[in-house]
From Swiss-Prot:
Keyword Chloroplast: yes
Annotated organelle transit peptide span: 1-46
Gene Ontology process terms (BP): L-leucine biosynthetic process
Lineage of source species: Eukaryota, Viridiplantae, Streptophyta, Embryophyta, Tracheophyta
Species whose genome carries this gene: Arabidopsis thaliana (Mouse-ear cress)
Regulation (activators, inhibitors): Feedback inhibition by Leu.
Outcome of gene disruption: Plants do not show any changes in soluble amino acid content.
Family from the record: Belongs to the alpha-IPM synthase/homocitrate synthase family. LeuA type 1 subfamily.
Gene name of the record: IPMS2
Enzyme Commission code: 2.3.3.13
Quaternary state and interactors: Homotetramer.
Protein's name according to its UniProt entry: 2-isopropylmalate synthase 2, chloroplastic
Keyword Chloroplast: yes
Domain (Pyruvate carboxyltransferase) ranges: 87-360
Length: 631
């Protein structure tokens, strides 16, 4: 059964990344003509007491939303695309994105995100690095068996990809994980820049070419018909050498050539020229798809990705919210919406198969599961992305929304109503709560709704009005939590200026048995965390602690995020360096009491860590050194 609880509000048809066109008639032969949405958007414009300009939206059954151009996703063939303007979206949130510090995901969370990515319509899901650990292998395999075999009514099913270094053990492990998907892919890589050859691999150019050629051929020999090859650090590699090694892996059977700007050093003009040069000078390039993978070290990942697509790349590698190692990766939402807004006008008619109205919900899921908060001014999905505070901008928006809005919030699935609709409060019932959650895009099962309803009533008793932001915080705290090894039942805090703070905490274990502990600390949170530690008995170090108010006012709900590292050295293998890295675990909590939300966050992080420990208790990995010669 599908465990994801997110859906885009009132959606049924895919968005194919192009500006709105006149409505199709009912007699249109477009395969999407029967999927028009029968709803109408109503906009309420108001000024808050802080002088901030807000736009609220609601939906009512009436006339259709603006339709989408009748461009179809081409049938999937690994090494070619029938429509020269179609750009494949390769999402690596579950692999490169998870390498962000503190972004450790459980197997269930990875599966939820993969299902949501399929709803979004990504062409390829890089589900992980199977050789990193047994847990990673099982997560990729599960995604291949489930998401990789779920075909929608239009025949769409995502490619499920596993990453591997250029050695037989990694490649065999990747194939064993992804082979259960209808469309499996192996993505193998080896460095090609002089600095990597000299200091990391300690190999000659000829040796690396031989390894790359043999390993691509080996991947094909396993029965995998879809093999992607990446020359790591291509942005700093010698051009003639790139043309040579890429030509050799094409002859060996590669179907996609991914060109990574691994350290994010190139400028858009440079990266676009790199793609153009590879397209013009690589033997056999017409028989493969060119891909981009741009890191964000100089803040240019989105620009470089678009430049690469404009120069001929027809696959782009991205992550939700741009998460990833160091400064992150090219952001899916930015790249996709740039192509949608400017594809026809500037990029020669490029388009994607992404249903953009699932963007906000996918972004929220990744944010909650990873614990990595999206900055307010983040393009497309940031809290301020559609806020207007300047008086001049407000005046323009009141006169015509197009003066300062290049896309509508509805295009990305953003819902902001309630200002002109039903106000939720202490007298609201379960049905009203469920309806509003559905409008916001959240579908909860009966158990989740029941638990949330009583938390909603508790908040409503203390607040005159429960806002959408409050609801989203409560939903996130209820359903975006790891499987409970420990559950917070009750707690009591005594604090003040006369002495040490004291805390009594009651937790329930997975069998329902209650445990109570008391402790003192330098503050209420410190005392509570020490009491939790006395019960759980799993040593951990608190690395980060942050808190923010979801809404304004003294009665605001607070969300807390913590990042911990287990003292028992939970580790996995870094896909790029091959080194063993210590895993960190994040947790989030929400509540009107900041100490309670803090303890919920800490218990959530501990549950993640304990869940990882359980999954890897029989770990049987043997990491290969990055300079090992494949057999």
């Amino acid at each position: 059964m599908e465990s994801s609880i997110l859906k885009s509000p009132n959606l049924s048809s895919p968005s194919f990344g192009v500006p709105s066109i006149p409505a199709l008639s009912s007699s249109s032969t477009s395969p999407f003509s029967s999927l028009h949405l029968r709803s109408q958007n109503h906009r309420t414009i108001s000024l808050t007491t802080a002088g901030k300009f807000r736009v609220s939206y609601s939906l009512s059954a009436s006339s259709p939303l603006p339709p989408h151009a009748p461009r179809r996703r081409p049938n999937y063939i690994p090494n070619r695309i029938s429509d020269p303007n179609y750009v494949r979206i390769f999402d690596t949130t579950l692999r490169d994105g998870e390498q962000s510090p503190g972004a450790t995901l459980t197997s269930k969370e990875k599966l939820d995100i993969a299902r949501q990515l399929a709803k979004l319509g990504v062409d390829i899901i890089e589900a992980g690095f199977p050789a990193a650990s047994k847990d990673d292998f099982e997560a990729v395999k599960t995604i291949a068996e489930t998401v990789g075999n779920t075909v929608d009514e239009n025949g769409y099913v995502p490619v499920i990809c596993g990453l591997s270094r250029c050695n037989k053990k990694d490649i065999e492990t990747a194939w064993e994980a992804v082979k259960y998907a209808k469309r499996p892919r192996i993505h193998t890589f080896i460095a090609t820049s002089d600095i990597h050859l000299k200091y990391k691999l300690k190999k000659s150019k000829e040796e690396v070419i031989e390894i790359a050629r043999n390993m691509v051929r080996f991947a094909r020999s396993l029965g995998c018909e879809d093999v992607e090859f990446s020359p790591e650090d291509a942005g700093r590699s010698e051009r003639e050498y790139l043309y040579e090694i890429l030509g050799e892996v094409i002859k060996a059977g590669a179907t996609t050539l991914n060109i990574p700007d691994t350290v994010g050093i190139t400028l858009p003009s440079e990266f676009g020229q790199l793609i153009a040069d590879i397209k013009a000078n690589t033997p056999g390039i017409q028989n493969v798809i060119i891909s981009t993978h741009c890191q964000n070290d100089l803040g240019l990942s989105t620009a470089n990705t678009l430049s690469g697509a404009h120069s001929g790349a027809r696959q782009v590698e991205v992550t939700i919210n741009g998460i990833g190692e160091r400064a992150g990766n090219a952001s899916l939402e930015e790249v996709v919406m740039a192509i949608k807004c400017r594809g026809d006008h500037v990029l020669g008619g490029l388009f994607t198969g992404i249903d953009t109205r699932h963007i906000v919900m996918t972004s929220k899921m990744v944010e909650e599961y990873t614990g990595m908060q999206t900055q307010p001014h983040k393009a497309i999905v940031g809290a301020n992305a559609f806020a207007h505070e300047s008086g001049i901008h407000q005046d323009g928006m009141l006169k015509h929304k197009g003066t300062y809005e290049i896309m509508s919030p509805e295009e990305i699935g953003l819902e902001r109503s309630n200002d002109a609709g039903i106000v939720l409060g202490k007298l609201s019932g379960r049905h009203a709560l469920k309806d509003r959650l559905n409008e916001l895009g959240y579908v909860l099962d009966d158990g989740q709704l029941s638990n949330l309803f009583w938390r909603f009533k508790a908040v409503a008793e203390q607040k005159k009005r429960v806002t959408d932001a409050d609801l989203i915080a409560l939903v996130s705290d209820e359903v975006f939590q790891p499987e409970a090894v420990w559950k917070l039942l009750d707690m009591q805090i005594t604090c003040g200026t006369l002495g040490l703070s004291t805390s009594t905490v009651k937790l329930a274990d997975s069998d329902g048995k209650e445990h109570v502990a008391c402790s003192v600390g330098t503050g209420p949170v410190d005392a509570a965390y020490k009491a939790v530690d006395l019960i759980v008995k799993e040593p951990a170090t608190l690395l980060e602690y942050s808190m923010n108010a979801v809404t304004e006012g003294i009665d605001a709900i607070a969300t807390t995020r913590v990042l911990i590292r287990g003292d028992n050295n939970y580790s996995s293998t870094n896909a790029v360096t091959g080194e063993s890295v210590e895993r960190t675990f994040s947790g989030t909590g929400a509540g009107m009491d900041i100490v309670v939300s803090s303890v919920k966050a800490y218990v959530g992080a501990l549950n993640k860590m304990l869940g990882f420990k359980e999954h890897t208790s029989t770990l049987s990995k043997t990491p290969l050194e990055t300079n090992e010669v494949p057999a």
